[in-house]
Amino acid sequence: MSKRNPKILKIFLYMLLLNSLFLIIYFVFHSSSFSPEQSQPPHIYHVSVNNQSAIQKPWPILPSYLPWTPPQRNLPTGSCEGYFGNGFTKRVDFLKPRIGGGGEGSWFRCFYSETLQSSICEGRNLRMVPDRIVMSRGGEKLEEVMGRKEEEELPAFRQGAFEVAEEVSSRLGFKRHRRFGGGEGGSAVSRRLVNDEMLNEYMQEGGIDRHTMRDLVASIRAVDTNDFVCEEWVEEPTLLVTRFEYANLFHTVTDWYSAYVSSRVTGLPNRPHVVFVDGHCTTQLEETWTALFSGIRYAKNFTKPVCFRHAILSPLGYETALFKGLSGEIDCKGDSAHNLWQNPDDKRTARISEFGEMIRAAFGLPVNRHRSLEKPLSSSSSSASVYNVLFVRREDYLAHPRHGGKVQSRLINEEEVFDSLHHWVATGSTGLTKCGINLVNGLLAHMSMKDQVRAIQDASVIIGAHGAGLTHIVSATPNTTIFEIISVEFQRPHFELIAKWKGLEYHAMHLANSRAEPTAVIEKLTEIMKSLGC
């Protein structure tokens, strides 16, 4: 037995060593095949400002709504629907969906309007690389960036700022390019998606000095699917918006309108998210952006490349009929959706009224009744009503980093005019026997956006000197009367046109200078009130 023990011990040690070797090989193979990087799903990032990004706001029911899709057949160029609705009837596919691709490939297309000579574009699986967009971060508080130049806030797009995925074998024109930014090194096989010839045809510069949306499209590269890597995804439909004159209400309304039209033309089932592809600081007007859409975010707030499952490129506000109508005659008048549904008319529109209702509904304000404050004058005269007369004031406020805090006066004796109106109403010397007046001091700059819209909604008559604040009349109710006081230096048609396109009654008082005679204003208001039945 003693001679056999060493032999048995050797066999035992050999078997133990062999088993240990097998265990080492197994665990090494297992750890390499199931690494944490491969077992974890890709990170999905949702655009949001409130950690509720999965929630998309539904479209509200609007009395003036008319169908947007499909667009009208044989829509005449220059029709009211062409200007204000879905005139984007020519579809151009720059990258078609891959047949049998399982829905993971990219596509990119634009819808062109012959009337507006602009395009609404959309794409699937569009990758944005923030490091390839040169601009300030955006979204800062105003006081943090005082003195910053506007050029720093507007985007400059490097090649490949946006990318789509395409099979290299499917198209000619691919070349190997260096990739800069986005934490990527080396090179990638890519091609320019939209050439200059196509840009000139479908995204004309027109009179716009810096057409940032055209520049964005020009930056898009189609890369091989193997080079299209996305760690972060935005699953909800997202509008990409670049704003000019972002602190001015009139120009911001053109941006809101363009974003609304883009959402409707592309048939979005719910309200989209918005990504600002600019570097502007925050303003009070973002209250309305947030109310209108499902969420807002700034492009530079993304710290790494991000992919949008469905992105829509909203045309610049300068390309809307609201702006283009200032320099050219748009022969359209406002009408009710009910009338247009029964009797279509290429020279009439309800789209501006629909948009105004959208703003009111976004703030939770009623859209099915005209006003809330037409009430009996007293218990003894129950048939008489009180009408709100809103005097929209211009007041000093700090608008943007290059602003000194002083607004340019359009009516040098505005305070005197308002005080005279107030005294006229307060002393009961209006001479109106069938109704009363509630004069509202419209210091809008110091009101929330919701309260501003509510004041417009509740007004029967809106008075004001020419100024951006009057743009709120897009949200006015039917039968509202607009009374604009126009100084000799500001003979511009902005608000006369909006009133016309909404079908509102409009009166203008043209001044010989910048001073209005209070008695003349009172006489004109008396005339307007009598036309209301007072």
UniProtKB/Swiss-Prot annotation:
Membrane topology: Single-pass type II membrane protein
Keyword Thylakoid tagged: no
Annotated InterPro entries: Glyco_transf_61_cat, Glycosyltransferase_61
PTM statement from Swiss-Prot or TrEMBL: Glycosylation at least at one of the two sites Asn-51 and Asn-301 is necessary for enzyme stability and activity.
Pathway: Protein modification; protein glycosylation
Reactions catalysed according to its record: N(4)-{beta-D-GlcNAc-(1->2)-alpha-D-Man-(1->3)-[beta-D-GlcNAc-(1->2)-alpha-D-Man-(1->6)]-beta-D-Man-(1->4)-beta-D-GlcNAc-(1->4)-beta-D-GlcNAc}-L-asparaginyl-[protein] + UDP-alpha-D-xylose = N(4)-{beta-D-GlcNAc-(1->2)-alpha-D-Man-(1->3)-[beta-D-GlcNAc-(1->2)-alpha-D-Man-(1->6)]-[beta-D-Xyl-(1->2)]-beta-D-Man-(1->4)-beta-D-GlcNAc-(1->4)-beta-D-GlcNAc}-L-asparaginyl-[protein] + UDP + H(+)
Primary location recorded for the protein, binned into one broad class: Golgi
EC category: transferase
Alphabetical GO biological process terms: post-translational protein targeting to membrane, translocation; protein N-linked glycosylation; shoot system development
Side of membrane Lumenal, spans: 35-534
Keywords assigned by UniProt, alphabetized: Glycoprotein, Glycosyltransferase, Golgi apparatus, Membrane, Signal-anchor, Transferase, Transmembrane, Transmembrane helix
UniProt GO cellular component terms: Golgi apparatus; Golgi medial cisterna; Golgi membrane; Golgi trans cisterna
Membrane-crossing residue ranges in chain numbering: 12-34
Enzyme Commission code: 2.4.2.38
An annotated Gene Ontology molecular function: glycoprotein 2-beta-D-xylosyltransferase activity
Membrane-side (Cytoplasmic) residue stretches: 1-11
Localization of this protein: Golgi apparatus membrane
Residues the record marks as carrying a glycan: 51, 301, 479
PANTHER family for this protein: INITIATOR BINDING DOMAIN-CONTAINING PROTEIN
Stated role: Glycosyltransferase involved in the xylosylation of N-glycans. Possesses beta-1,2-xylosyltransferase activity, transferring xylose from UDP-xylose to the core beta-linked mannose of N-glycans. Involved in the biosynthesis of glycoprotein bound N-glycans. Does not require metal ions for its activity.
Other noteworthy facts: Renders plant glycoproteins immunogenic and allergenic in human. This is due to the presence of beta-1,2-xylose and/or core alpha-1,3-fucose which are not found in mammalian proteins, and which constitute epitopes for carbohydrate-reactive antibodies.
Name of the protein this chain belongs to: Beta-1,2-xylosyltransferase
Species name: Arabidopsis thaliana (Mouse-ear cress)
